[in-house]
Amino acid sequence: MPRTPHLLAIQSHVVFGHAGNAAAVFPMQRIGINVWPLNTVQFSNHTQYGRWTGQVLPPEQIPALVDGIAGIGELGNCDAVLSGYLGSAAQGRAILDVVARIKQANPRALYLCDPVMGHPEKGCIVAPEVSDFLLEEAAAVADYLCPNQLELDSFCDRQPNSLADCVEMARSLLARGPRAILVKHLNYPGKAGDTFEMLLVAADQAWHLQRPLLAFPRQPVGVGDLASGLFLSRLLLGDDLRNAFEFTGAAVHEVLLETQACGSYELELVRAQDRIAHPRVRFDAVRL
């Protein structure tokens, strides 16, 4: 029987609803991953509600929790680290120390950085020190980097004029160290208004994926967290880059279809769980 992969997921958590680990952990488990959730913040709900309660995890707790895992002899079983929303730059540096420690224990372990800064329609939502950390430090360590358009623009200090520009910008990030760049949400002049587009770029390949853009009264939160988690999970389960990319696009679309059908603001992960594991739709990525 194949071994079940283990993944350390270090990002935000909400008690109510789905964002950060609350959006990613269950779907990753549902498709066959043992997830170790480590929450950088614990809030009552996501911040787009306009009010919330909760607190940021002190940075020193991150290595302390990993010490506990090492103490029971399990650290070498970690196959990947996923990082997302950070409450502070100090948290980010603690995560990079953890990544180095895990890679020492398991040299094959992967690190996917979801450089959460904000959203093209909402602007930057993190402190400048967090943005600086992601731009200047995290990208050099990540095996996979998963920005949205705002974050890609921030990394490259420019905005695209076309899809070709987006490819060029993503490819320029490979020089910093990542094996591949997954742009989870493209937005560029000339883009069709009725499609949602994603981009995957590696040294020897570039793939473009389009799916229908679904309308919501309020855009659900956590879609990017879901996408990053599914993409890394499928890589751990043996998919190549293209297949992991196509699976991610299909599974996320299935969740959004269920969410739209229910008239929900929060992602309908539980109702869509079988469609996450076995998407009924598939969108073919086009090689560029």
From Swiss-Prot:
Cofactor(s) listed: Mg(2+)
Alphabetical UniProt keywords: ATP-binding, Kinase, Magnesium, Nucleotide-binding, Transferase
Source species, domain of life: Bacteria
Enzyme nomenclature, EC number: 2.7.1.35
Binding site for ATP: 114, 151, 184, 211-214
Pathway: Cofactor metabolism; pyridoxal 5'-phosphate salvage; pyridoxal 5'-phosphate from pyridoxal: step 1/1
CDD domains (UniProt xref): pyridoxal_pyridoxamine_kinase
Claim: Magnesium is one of the keywords in the record: yes
Function: Pyridoxal kinase involved in the salvage pathway of pyridoxal 5'-phosphate (PLP). Catalyzes the phosphorylation of pyridoxal to PLP.
Family recorded in the similarity comment: Belongs to the pyridoxine kinase family. PdxY subfamily.
Protein name, per record: Pyridoxal kinase PdxY
Gene that encodes it: pdxY
